[in-house]
Swiss-Prot record:
Function: Inhibits p53/TP53- and TP73/p73-mediated cell cycle arrest and apoptosis by binding its transcriptional activation domain. Inhibits degradation of MDM2. Can reverse MDM2-targeted degradation of TP53 while maintaining suppression of TP53 transactivation and apoptotic functions.
The protein's name in its UniProt record: Protein Mdm4
Residue span(s) of domain SWIB/MDM2: 26-109
GO cellular component: nucleus; transcription repressor complex
Upper lineage: Eukaryota, Metazoa, Chordata, Craniata, Vertebrata
Chief place of localization: nucleus
GO molecular function: enzyme binding; ubiquitin-protein transferase activity; zinc ion binding
Length: 490
């Protein structure tokens, strides 16, 4: 029996180690009240996945119209089956903790149900083994003449049976306790994946269309824009804002050593538990720092309203959080950025004419002696005399003015070239800012890595925080990271 309990503990620990890869497709069995709600929303069967449970709950809220028409993240469930099950009158989708508490109480994993059935069968077999048969009763009746011998035999028979029962009960209690902890950890990890920044309302709303379960647990979600819009696939690669996989955490440079699952000792299990709790705390801290609710500077006046679905969004969001419509007049007030997005050719800046009204020729002029026109009759009669000294002085003055004009035109051309060069560099900087993060290649570059008097804007805020926590250097210049700040482009 000791070997049986040890093997059960090892198998339970192995299954706990595989939670990270199997928790997405975890099969759960809802209790009766929750099952009635799911069936009212169109669910069939008694075993579902976590995604299907969340989908049918959203369907139930949509069909019953329990949400507020103006602020659709508020759900009023008072006087309804859902309210009786939750034990509250209303809740917000942005803070779905009452919903998760209800699911923890009313969901049972299918693995634990199978284990309970196996334990019931084993206890029934032990009970049948302990019941005396008819032959034993007849044999005891024939030997009733010797009561001392019968009592001794009964004592010797009940002693190993009681010991076996005690061992069985202890092993069963250990197994049930371990399974309850395992089940709770599975559900906690499932809810930890969903509770990243609050359950988005558009996820529940858009699941009512084109919901087709597949073998790999993925579904297709169609946005509620026009018919010719793109299809978003519900996978861990596309929905990075809902699920952050372990591979993405390791890709940034944070390497965590995995715990040894084969070690059955209590010390190993406590270390594994500490590592899992530490990872949860880090993820909660990151989600709190990235969520819009923790930003105290953003007020309701700064939020922008979507023209498609009339939802108010954070000023730092480019797309609507519900329908993914592009924000109207996005970067319309920034002429340089609009120009860099529309065309790649940079138009020349008009030349600054300091000396307006002066005709500057393109080639060298031919200088000749000036023609003096007589103003009165006396000068008309008198022939003009040619003075070589005066003509030479005039030529020198003409040469000096020409050299000054050439120097000024050269300076103007040099200034124009330098301005064009700086403009080109600024355009390249704007184009680099528009590129995605150099590490995850998904999120925008909003994490400014500061080192000394310089900084680099090459990664997103999420990856920059992970680089700072892991003690890594700047990916651009390999300097030590001193501070990481989040940049909002307005």
């Amino acid at each position: 029996m000791t070997s049986h309990s040890t093997s059960a503990q090892c198998s339970a620990s192995d299954s706990a180690c595989r939670i990270s890869s199997e928790q997405i497709n975890q099969q759960v069995r809802p209790k009766l009240q929750l099952l009635k709600i799911l069936q009212a929303a169109g669910a069939q069967g008694e075993v579902f996945t976590m995604k299907e449970v969340m989908h049918y709950l959203g369907q139930y809220i949509m069909v019953k119209q329990l949400y507020d028409q103006q602020e659709q993240h508020l759900v009023y469930c008072g006087g309804d089956l859902l309210g009786d099950l939750l034990g509250c009158q209303s809740f917000s989708v942005k803070d779905p903790s009452p919903l998760y508490d209800m699911l923890r109480k009313n969901l049972v994993t299918s693995a634990s149900v199978n284990t309970d059935a196996a334990q019931t069968l084993a206890l029934a077999q032990d009970h049948t083994m302990d019941i005396p048969s008819q032959d034993r009763l007849k044999h005891g009746a024939t030997e009733c003449s010797n009561p001392r011998k019968r009592t001794e035999e009964d004592d010797t028979h009940t002693l190993p049976t009681s010991r076996r029962k005690c061992r069985d009960s202890r092993a069963d209690e250990d197994l049930i306790e371990h399974l309850s902890q395992d089940e709770t950890s599975r559900l906690d990890l499932d809810f930890e994946e969903w509770d990243v920044a609050g359950l988005p309302w558009w996820f529940l709303g858009n699941l009512r269309n084109n919901y087709i379960p597949r073998s790999n647990g993925s579904t297709d979600l169609q946005t509620n824009q026009d018919i010719g819009t793109a299809i978003v696939s519900d996978t861990t690669d596309d929905l990075w804002f809902l699920n952050e996989t372990v591979s993405e955490q390791l890709g940034v440079g944070v390497k965590v050593e995995a715990a040894n699952c084969e070690q059955p000792s209590e010390v190993g299990r406590t270390r594994d538990k500490k590592m899992v709790e530490g990872g949860k705390d880090d993820d909660l801290e990151d989600s709190k720092s990235l969520s819009d609710d923790t930003d105290v500077e953003v007020t309701s006046e700064d939020e922008w309203q979507c023209t498609e679905c009339k939802k108010f969004n954070s000023p730092s969001k480019r797309y609507c959080f519900r329908c993914w419509a592009l924000r109207k007049d996005w970067y319309s007030d920034c002429s340089k950025l609009t120009h860099s997005l529309s065309t790649s050719n940079i138009t020349a800046i008009p030349e600054k004419k300091d000396n307006e009204g002066i005709d500057v020729p393109d080639c060298r002029r031919t200088i000749s002696a000036p023609v003096v026109r007589p103003k009165d009759g006396y000068l008309k009669e008198e022939k003009p005399r040619f003075d070589p000294c005066n003509s030479v002085e005039f030529l020198d003055l003409a040469h000096g003015s020409e050299s000054q004009e050439i120097i000024s035109s050269t300076r103007e051309q040099t200034d124009i070239f330098s301005e064009q060069k700086t403009e080109t560099e600024s355009m390249e900087d704007f184009q680099n800012v528009l590129k995605p993060c150099s590490l995850c290649e998904k999120r925008p570059r909003d994490g400014n890595i500061i080192h000394g008097k310089t900084s680099h804007l090459t990664t997103c805020f999420h990856c920059a925080r992970r680089l700072k926590k892991s003690g890594a250097s700047c990916p651009a210049c390999k300097k030590e990271i001193q501070l990481v700040i989040k940049v909002f482009i307005a």
